[in-house]
């Protein structure tokens, strides 16, 4: 059997798995063949995807797709379950600083219609509950709470408000109206310090007035008190500092993985696995220690491939910077099929990739990190970081994937594209990708193919 790095469909992974087993594959308790997720969980979309062929990628996918089992097992063992919504990376750091607490994002249900190819009927159920297709696919979260089939009911539900997208805010309020108690905390819209106003440096080369940092710190103090009451332990500075250091361990690994993959002469790991790996930073897929182990495996695989000049995408592939997560994972495969490769990304949570400052009081450090969220500040700030990372990654083109119905996507894509074109002059497009994009594959393919060809033609000028 060919063991060089490559992409495999699900049928090919069946054979690959049996070969790995014969060769002595050692797996964690959640391991097993990928196909079982189709049979048991009805994750039919896996049958349409291409996967990396490494045992490290197998571990990554099994880790992602067994989160509900992990949460159910944690509850059975007496752990407290915290549902955190919208902040994408801040509250989980606090939750995991306490013993016996697990955090997850109910927002993650937005990928369920994709994975189950809408057989779950979550989007239709959301529409029956008054949240129709004019809202972001995160509306799938609403019926998921009601059915209890996709994640356990949290012991504590925490949601950020203030500088959040309108459709998510409306969905969360509807959720509370249905009887799900929510602990709200507020984050203001980030702005630059005014003349003469004391400012604070934030991760990601950003800044905010000290008054905003103080405001968020006070809100996170309230969150910490609620988490402590749930756990029966005080979330003091010592615990919080240790939690920050542990979170930064995962973030450092991910940073090294991203730099190694995106700077390599060709792609040593496919775009789809990189997207999933980056998602782990948000809440550690409900297991912080295992997230570190999964990332260590991926990094070791990638470093080995780079040393041996083994890649899954050829050196001629056009270097693409991708903005926003895709509602349909199939789109990441499609880009590579058409001659592109990812050389950089902004999947809406860059603040969850940046290191949390360890030289500040813990709550202040987390407040600064929360305010660095690209979605709570001006789009121009986000675009400036995209431009810097495009230049660092030698991007030849930019794709902004618009999320259907998402209120934050109404104008931000246009603004980002305008700034990218003005500052670095590379081709850039905006695409809307629905949860299942099969009906649009031809159109999406044509637009991506044109972008790749234009970028490739630009090499000869």
What kind of feature is each model-predicted range?
Residues 83-92, 161-168, 321-329, 404-411, ...:
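Gly/Ser/Thr-rich loops at beta-strand to alpha-helix junctions
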Residues 151-238, 242, 246-256:
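Internal, well-ordered alpha/beta segment that forms a basic, Gly-enriched binding/recognition surface
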Residues 6, 12, 414-461:
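Peripheral docking tails and interdomain loops at the edges
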Residues 2-80, 213-349, 353-354:
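A charged, amphipathic alpha-helical module
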Residues 76-78, 87-89, 96-126, 322-387, ...:
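Redox- and metal-dependent alpha/beta enzyme cores, enriched for Fe-S-associated oxidoreductases
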Residues 96-100, 172-179, 333-338, 415-425, ...:
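Short, surface-exposed basic-aromatic patches at helix termini and helix-loop junctions that form
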Residues 61-150, 155-156, 163, 167-172:
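An N-terminal, globular interaction/scaffold subdomain
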Residues 377-424:
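C-terminal hydrophobic structural anchor segments
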């Amino acid at each position: 059997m060919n063991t060089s790095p490559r992409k495999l469909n699900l049928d090919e992974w069946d054979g690959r798995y049996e070969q790995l087993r014969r060769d002595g594959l050692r797996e964690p308790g959640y391991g097993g063949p990928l196909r079982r997720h189709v049979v048991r969980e009805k994750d039919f979309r896996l049958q349409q995807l291409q996967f990396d062929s490494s045992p490290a990628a197998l571990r990554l996918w099994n880790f992602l797709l067994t989160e509900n089992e992990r949460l159910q097992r944690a509850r059975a063992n007496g752990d407290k379950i915290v549902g955190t919504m919208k902040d994408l990376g801040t509250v989980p750091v606090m939750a995991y600083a306490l013993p016996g607490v697990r955090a997850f994002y109910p927002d993650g249900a937005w990928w369920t219609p994709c994975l189950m190819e809408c057989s779950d009927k979550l989007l239709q159920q959301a529409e029956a509950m008054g949240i129709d297709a004019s809202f972001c696919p995160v509306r799938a979260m609403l019926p998921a709470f009601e059915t209890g089939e996709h994640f356990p009911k949290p012991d504590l539900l925490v949601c950020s408000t203030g500088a959040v997208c309108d459709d998510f805010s409306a969905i969360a309020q509807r959720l509370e109206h249905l009887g799900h108690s929510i602990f709200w905390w507020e984050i203001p819209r980030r702005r630059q310090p005014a003349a003469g106003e004391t400012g604070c440096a934030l991760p990601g080369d950003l800044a905010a007035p000290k008054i905003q940092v103080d405001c968020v710190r006070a809100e996170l103090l309230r969150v910490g008190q609620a988490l402590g009451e749930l756990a029966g332990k005080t979330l003091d500075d010592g615990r919080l500092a240790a939690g920050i250091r542990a979170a930064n361990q995962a973030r450092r690994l991910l940073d090294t993985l991203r730099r190694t993959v995106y700077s390599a002469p060709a792609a040593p790991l496919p775009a789809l696995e990189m997207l999933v790996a980056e998602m782990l930073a948000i809440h550690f897929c409900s297991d912080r220690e295992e997230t570190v182990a999964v990332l260590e495996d991926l990094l070791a695989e990638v470093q080995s491939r780079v040393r041996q000049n083994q890649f899954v995408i050829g050196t001629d592939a056009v270097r693409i910077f991708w903005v926003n997560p895709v509602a349909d994972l199939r789109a990441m495969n499609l880009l590579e099929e058409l001659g592109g490769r990812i050389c950089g990304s902004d999947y809406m949570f860059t603040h969850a990739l940046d290191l949390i400052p360890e030289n500040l009081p813990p709550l202040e450090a987390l407040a600064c990190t929360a305010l660095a969220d690209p979605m709570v500040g001006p789009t121009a700030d986000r675009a400036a970081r995209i431009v810097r990372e495009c230049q660092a990654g030698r991007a030849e083109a930019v794709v902004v994937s618009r999320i259907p119905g998402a209120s934050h996507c109404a104008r931000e894509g246009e603004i980002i594209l305008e700034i990218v074109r003005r500052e670095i002059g590379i081709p850039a497009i905006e695409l809307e990708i629905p949860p299942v994009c099969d009906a649009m594959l031809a159109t999406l393919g044509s637009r991506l193919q044109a972008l790749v060809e234009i970028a490739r033609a630009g090499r000869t000028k």
